[in-house]
Curated annotation (Swiss-Prot):
GO terms for biological process: cAMP biosynthetic process; intracellular signal transduction. It is found in: Cell membrane. Mg(2+) binds at residues 108, 151. It catalyses: ATP = 3',5'-cyclic AMP + diphosphate. This is Receptor-type adenylate cyclase. Residues 103-257 form the Guanylate cyclase domain. Binds 1 Mg(2+) ion per subunit. Pfam families: Guanylate_cyc (PF00211), Peripla_BP_A-cyclase (PF25493). Its EC number is 4.6.1.1. Gene3D superfamilies: Nucleotide cyclase.
Length: 469
């Protein structure tokens, strides 16, 4: 009992360990007077795991899978929302106070209809790049994208200087971007040469420049920009969940943009004087004097922002503004959004009827699937849909919008073709870019496009074929 109590005190009663260990002989086991072979001792027991500090294969696989899942969650919860929000309007940046002046920016691509007619395979990607570059600048300068219509942007800013910086950087950004082709620049130069041949008083600002000089000043799409500052009627659109700006300020900004040339930035005196003296010292402007604008009672004092030093421009497009010429309309004032059947040209109505007949046997879901690529490639806004599938009205609206855009391009080609045929009848020649002598003649259906790129056309080799149909 004494031994058991002693062992209990030493923590060995449950046989969890041993203390006072000694080695006895068999004789000692039979005779207690014989001493043990070794003196009693309590060893220090340290247990070691041979796999300590190592990871098993199964555990390693688990760590890899867990790490991959964690990385996926970071991407899903962080990066994806970033890109989603990056491509949407941030209403926090929208000017909302009715008593605070708003600076509005309107942009438009010069000769976009002609470019679509000449390069239908290039323009979808070029316009997508145009949108991406401008949206990156909107975010950089804390401005607000009000809307895009076709090739045009309407942008609002609480800060006049931020708006001016955006417009200046836009021109530099487009100049230094790699567009991957010279076709757009060649088309702009050809358009200038054609106008010079038709108008003896017109001097092409870029078509006759030395190649090295041209490359320092011009590259890719040419975007004209108009800026105006003033009070607006501000409304929140319950459909788009965004803010829109109405009234005289909006009209003035749009008119300012419409008289400019591609690559030119115009601002009204109201926008220029909204800048502080220090801000005005940071920009280079040229006073253009009073400029008459359609729908404005008195001429408006205008300034040109010299975003790219050395650029020269043709005279302001006052005749286009006053006559409301529709060859190269400012798409913010003539939208693809509302294209009723009666508003469509003959060519556009034929396109719409063809699409309706072609897709009439499809279900709404199939029609939507077929129409979306056309809308995306022609940069036509999609109709508002109810649920996941467009209804019949939505499909009809998409068809009308596509037909309106393509119809304008085809009408442009028809006018150019008619002009070319007229010049040929007078003894002139029309040469294609590759050097072959050709003429584009509209067929009886009035469908044609520049260089036979779309529609129903006839190409005639003037040297080898003297007959026409």
């Amino acid at each position: 009992v004494d031994t058991a109590e002693k062992l209990s005190k030493n923590g060995c009663a449950s046989n969890y360990g041993a203390t006072q260990i000694s080695v006895w002989s068999m004789a000692r086991a039979l005779n207690a007077s014989i001493p043990p072979l070794t003196n009693p001792m309590t060893p220090s027991m340290t247990f070691r795991n041979s796999n300590a500090g190592r990871i098993s294969g199964v555990a390693l696989v688990g760590v890899i899978i867990g790490g991959a899942l964690a990385l996926f969650l970071v991407v899903a919860l962080g990066v994806v929302p970033y890109f989603f929000l990056h491509n949407t309007r941030d209403n926090n940046l929208a000017p909302k106070e009715l008593t605070d002046p708003v600076t509005l920016i309107f942009t438009d691509i010069e000769s976009s209809t002609a470019l679509w007619a000449a390069h239908p395979e290039l323009m979808p990607d070029a316009v997508a790049t145009h949108h991406r570059l401008i949206r990156s600048l909107i975010g950089r300068y804390g401005c607000y994208e009000v809307k895009t219509v076709g090739d045009s942007f309407m942008i609002a800013s609480k800060s006049p200087f931020a708006a001016v910086q955006l417009a200046q950087e836009l021109q530099l950004c487009f100049l230094h971007h790699d567009w991957g082709t010279n076709a757009i620049d060649e088309s702009y130069q050809q358009l200038e040469q054609q106008r010079a041949e038709e108008d003896a008083k017109y001097t092409p600002p870029t078509a006759r420049l030395d190649l090295k000089v041209y490359s320092r000043l011009w590259n890719g799409l040419r975007v004209r920009v108009g800026i105006h500052t003033g009070l607006c009627d501000i409304r929140r659109d319950e459909v788009t969940k965004g803010y829109d700006y109405y009234g005289r300020t909006s009209n003035m900004a749009a008119r300012t943009e419409s008289v400019g040339n591609g690559g030119q930035v115009l601002m009204t005196t109201a926008a220029y004087m909204s800048l502080s003296a220090e801000e005005r010292e940071q920009i280079d402007v040229t006073a253009l004097g009073d400029v008459p604008l359609r729908g404005v009672a008195k001429p408006v004092e205008m300034y040109q922002l010299n975003a790219v030093p050395g650029r020269t421009f043709a005279g302001l497009r006052l005749e286009h503004e006053l006559l409301n010429d529709d060859e190269d309309q400012t798409t913010t004032s003539c939208s693809d959004h509302s294209s009723s059947r009666t508003d469509l040209s003959v060519a556009a109505q034929t396109i719409a009827a063809s699409l309706q007949s072609l897709l009439g046997t499809f279900t709404p879901a199939q029609r939507q699937k077929a129409l979306i690529p056309f809308c995306e490639r022609w940069r036509v806004p999609l109709p508002q849909k109810v649920g996941n599938v467009w209804d019949n009205d939505g499909c009809q609206e998409a068809i009308r919008r596509v037909a309106a855009k393509v119809g304008r391009v085809m009408d442009f080609g028809t006018r150019k073709a008619s002009s070319s045929v007229t010049s040929l009848e007078r003894g002139g020649s029309l040469f294609s870019a590759g050097g072959a002598t050709v003429a584009t003649v509209a067929s009886s259906s009035n469908f044609s496009c520049v260089d036979g790129r779309c529609g129903t056309v006839q190409l005639i080799d003037l040297e080898n074929d003297s007959t026409t149909s």
